[in-house]
Structures are given as structure tokens and as C-alpha cells.
Amino acid sequence: MDTETSPLLSHNLSTREGIKQSTQGFLAHTIARHPGITAIILGILILLVIILIVVAIVYYNRSVDCKSTMPKLPPPGYYVQQPEPHHHFPVFFRKRKNSTTQQHIPSDEQLAELAHS
């Protein structure tokens, strides 16, 4: 579409160009009048971006490390030490005494009776 055939479009383009030129002019004018402040602000912005990138990398590495170390055994104090050494469940699994899975596991006395019979 030609800009001469549509006066609304040409007005819109000229307004955009005017805003763009005035913004560029304002920035150039500010940089020319205050070069020290502009350099300080740009330096701070660059440092913030670098810090943000470093924090993102460290956070990503930590989350990857946590996922890769999950299958390893936790420290020794994590599990509750009980007389039967073949049960290695964390504390929150031991709260319920009469669960359905515990009823199907025979005790040592029941196993001895079954072996003698």
C-alpha cells in the first residue's frame, strides 16, 4: 500500500518517525550534556546484567546437582535406627503401625513357627 494513497497511514508513520527522532535526540542531548553520569549508569546496568547471568548459572547448576545427587544415600542420621536392619524407610513411612503392607510381612516368631511346622 502506498503512503500517498492513505493519508492516515502516512500520518501514523510520520508520527512514529517523529517520536523516534525526538527520543534519539533527547538521548543524544542527555549523553552529550552528562557523559559521566551516562557512563556510570551504563556501567551499573552492565554489572547488573553480568550478576544476573552469574546468579542464573549458579542456580541452574545447583538444581542440576540436586537432581543428580538424589539417588545417593543421605547422611547417616537421616534414617531411624531400629532393631530390624532390613527396613530402611524414612521416618514419615513409620508413623502408621497398622498399614496394609505391614500386615502381610510375618514377624520373626511367625517365620520360626512356620519353619518348625
UniProtKB/Swiss-Prot annotation:
Cellular component, GO annotation: host cell endoplasmic reticulum membrane; membrane; virion membrane
Subcellular location: Virion membrane; Host endoplasmic reticulum membrane
Spans annotated as Disordered: 97-117
Transmembrane segments: 39-59
Induction (UniProt): Expressed in the late phase of the viral replicative cycle.
Membrane topology reported for the UniProt record: Single-pass membrane protein
Glycosylation: residue positions: N12, N61, N98
Location, primary (coarse class): virion
GO biological process: symbiont-mediated suppression of host innate immune response
Keywords per UniProt: Glycoprotein, Host endoplasmic reticulum, Host membrane, Host-virus interaction, Inhibition of host innate immune response by virus, Membrane, Transmembrane, Transmembrane helix, Viral immunoevasion, Virion
Keyword Glycosyltransferase tagged: no
Oligomeric and partner information: Interacts with the minor capsid protein M1249L and with the hexon capsid protein p72 capsomers; these interactions form a rigid zipper structure that stabilizes the capsomers. Interacts with host STING1.
Functional summary from the UniProt entry: Together with the penton and the other minor capsid proteins (M1249L, p49), forms a complicated network immediately below the outer capsid shell, stabilizing the whole capsid. Three copies of p17 encircle each p72 capsomer in the inner capsid shell, anchoring p72 capsomers on the inner membrane. Required for the assembly of the capsid and icosahedral morphogenesis. Additionally, inhibits the host cGAS-STING pathway through its interaction with STING1 and subsequent interference of the recruitment of downstream components TBK1 and IKBKE.
Family: Belongs to the asfivirus minor capsid protein p17 family.
Name of the protein in its database record: Minor capsid protein p17
